[in-house]
Amino acid sequence: MYEGKHIHFSEVDNKPLCSYSPKLCKQRRLNGYAFCIRHVLEDKTAPFKQCEYVAKYNSQRCTNPIPKSEDRRYCNSHLQVLGFIPKKERKKKTDPVDEVKARHQMDAMAFSLTVPTLALKMPNGLDSMSLSPPGARVPLHYLDTELEDPFAFNEEDDDLKKGVTVRKKLQSKLAQNRQRQRETEILKVRQEHFSTPPTPPQQHTHLSPLSTSLKPPAPPQGSVCKSPQPQNTSLPMQGVAPTTHSIAQIRQASHKRPLPLLPSSRAPISDAPRTDRILMKAAAFSPHLSCISRLQRLVKLCTQKRQLDADLFPHLGLDWSEESGEELEDADQASPYQVAWSIRETLRHERHTSDDDDMESRSSRVTQLCTYFQQKYKHLCRLERAESRQKKCRHTFRKALLQAASKEPECTGQLIQELRRAACSRASLRQTKLKEVEPAACSGTVKGEQCTKQALPFTRHCFQHILLNRSQQLFSSCTAKFADGQQCSVPVFDITHQTPLCEEHAKKMDNFLRGDNSRKVQHQQQRKPRKKTKPPALTKKHKKKRRRGPRRPQKPIPPAVPQGNLSMPTSVSLPVEASQMRSPSTPELSADELPDDIANEITDIPHDLELNQEDFADVLPRLPDDLQDFDFFEGKNGDLLPTTEEAEELERALQAVTSLECLSTIGVLSQSDGVPVQGLSDRGMGVFSTGTDASGIQSLSREVNTDLGELLNGRIVHDSFSSLELDENLLHSAPLSSPPTALAGQIQGQFSAPASAGLTSATLLSQSALGERAFPGQFHGLHDGSHASQRPHPAQLLSKADDLITSRQQYSSDHSHSSPHGSHYDSEHVPSPYSDHITSPHTSYSGDNMAATFSAEMPIMAQHLLPTQLEVPLGGVVNPRTHWGNLPVNLGDPSAFSNLLGADGHLLSTSLSTPPTTSNSETTQPAFATVTPSSSSVLPGLPQTSFSGMGPSAELMASTSPKQQLPQFSAAFGHQLSSHSGIPKDLQPSHSSIAPPTGFTATGATATSTNNASPPFPSPN
């Protein structure tokens, strides 16, 4: 079984519901299918087909299913729309009591129908029937039970099978309605009119219960104040008193006796033996009140009947539709039988005529004719009964009026006057609704005098003064104004426009609009011949411009650079201006090649023309449709503000510039400080100072920081940087191969005991952009033999090296936790470089060994050197648990820092791409690789002193890569350094460095904060 997409079950009995795919349907499924009857067409295997009706308004086909077994093309709804079957009638509410009576008490009426002999011989299923006598009666309940016409034609014809079901329903409904209506009309009236109880022959004794027994019951629908049968007024008024006691009995028996329905010619004969019904004389009703009460009761019944026939709620605005109105008119003229069958026969006749079906059998036509005559006969019988009821009602009312007038004329006269007064009031109400109100004079005043004009209907003002009536909502004042600004006050009756205009201003507006259109047409006509006179080349060049509409004189475009007064002076030569504004699409045209008519036209353009609304009328419709999606003031992403990536990039660049400016003030701040311990501690550059000649160390720090500030502030121009790679002559082999032992001895003499410190590779690598270029003349004589007097302070070199190490390591240690790998900037966690907050990180050194190593009065080392960067092993042995990226360096050997300065006074930088130096010992390379794996760069300036206990014969600067990559500081500030120091953009170094060790990222070098700095080494207690 095929199922749709929506598989769901009922919440009541958990049975599967319709699985219609497009939307959720909660109808029950058909047996054997997964869809309801409305959506069963989704299952292609179902024995249903789709209705072929196509709607005119949307050209969509009807989706109602039709069983394939039925030979029809349309569903039931569209069969009614197309007129093939009659439309459904409106159901009328009936009294349930009447339904019970109509169901159990069948009508005695029967109709006689003589069947033609020709119809009996035709093959219509009636061959076995015999001729019915003229008086044969077919009971009406036959239609209620069988619901089929006994004289119906054969249903073998396919075209006639379509309306079988509808015809059966129609016949059953019509028969039931007619039966109910006839029963209620006949039975109720017989019970209410002049039915006296059986009494003795005395006249005065049988009238007292009459007044009590004749209480008017609630009139049901269809009850009329009519007598049971017509009275023969031509018969004499015989006062047969002994027969009055049998009146009630006869009438009660008449309820059970069938009433023969005969043609109108036989009706008087049927009423002949019932002459005793009119034996009630006025003398028989001596109490006067009984006559008046009977008359009042009859009047009340007639009024109720009239109210039942009238509209129930006319004041609510409820009215019949056009279709229902037509149906009511047809029902007044003919019975539902005649209406239904006449429409059916007409449709059949039209269909047969259009199809030109000559093969229709004679039997079907005869059967059809018999059916029509049957319905026609029933209709005539119904009309005859209705007419007889009307006559009985009028006769009864006249008799009651005569009796009341003879016995109690005064009361009868009052009753008649009341009836006339009520009738006159109803008629006057109708007349007041229809007739017009008499015109009255206007109540307005003109210059203090009463207006003599006639007032408008239903008002007290004329048309001129109608605006004085504040309650009216039909008229409004003209919304136009005169030339002097005065508002027009003419009343206007205009309910279609939001801005009503009087007749005068409406004409002016029409003329203006008509003139505007004529001007447009004239303008277009003037433009057409000018197009034809254009040269072919020029027309071809400016083909796209001509599509934009008529040429309007406009002001010349002002020059790009303001010339003081932004308004265009009139003395400017317009032809020259036009030649300057010529489009680059026509570079071959010069001012001399322009046609004369164009030059003359340009010179004739006035300079004070303003753009009007009509100037854009022809231009805006010619603009392309896709121009509305283009915004001249938006970016390519469609927003006015920069994107998130652009904003973050801009913020990082500004923070980087701020960091550079902070670094550039190092030299100035260091010169103002006189204490060597606090000289550069706030900037993250500590100084190893001893008790010997602190002023020399301070002067060296000032010189270095001054040149560093000049480098960062761009005072050193890019002309002095010929390449980002250091020349080989800057790396002399003498200091690299033979470190001075004198400096080592002095350093060992300065410190009381040898100390081994673990400098991380990131710390040694941090000697980056601070010394990115050689500083000319600052350290020129430090390694020169002729200036040996300037070299007795190796602590200065150590201080300078640690200054650089500490400042760069501070960037690494402070921001390695806040910046993700792979990003150059961190816009969220950039602390202030002026922060002096100091935390206490974990320490891994021994206090006893430090007490033996440094004296109590030794100045504080770099505050920003973390304890993980300085490892002091016990007993001079290197800590076997080396941290990632830590490189143990012996602080007692100054040769580890002596070669940071070249032979000719240049500070060597490990941040630039330097060529690999030759190693004296190949055995030291694996050891270095194990200590600093994945380091960002190698250290070309370090000597072959003891690294992790290795001998001084090894040179650890060898590298397997041909070029050393930029470290983190240079990678982060490459753009800012190039913009400040003038490094060309094409010479900026690459950022594709080797992955740094854990804890140090490229972003960590971008910040300049001193947060999380390590405390200084404690003094021994």
From Swiss-Prot:
Component of the chromatin remodeling INO80 complex; specifically part of a complex module associated with the N-terminus of INO80. The keyword Iron does not apply. The gene is Ino80d. Residues 911-926, 995-1014 have a biased composition (Low complexity). It comes from the Eukaryota. Pfam families: zf-C3Hc3H (PF13891). One of its GO terms (biological process) is positive regulation of DNA repair. There is a cross-link at residue 87 (Glycyl lysine isopeptide (Lys-Gly) (interchain with G-Cter in SUMO2)). InterPro entries: Potential_DNA-bd. One of its GO terms (cellular component) is Ino80 complex. It comes from Mus musculus. Its main location: nucleus. Residues 194-239, 514-570, 808-844, 911-940, 976-1021 are annotated as: Disordered. Putative regulatory component of the chromatin remodeling INO80 complex which is involved in transcriptional regulation, DNA replication and probably DNA repair. This is INO80 complex subunit D. Belongs to the INO80D family. Residues 520-554 have a biased composition (Basic residues). Keywords: DNA damage, DNA recombination, DNA repair, Isopeptide bond, Nucleus, Phosphoprotein, Transcription, Transcription regulation, Ubl conjugation. The modification Phosphoserine is found at residue 132. Residues 224-239, 931-940 have a biased composition (Polar residues). It is found in: Nucleus.
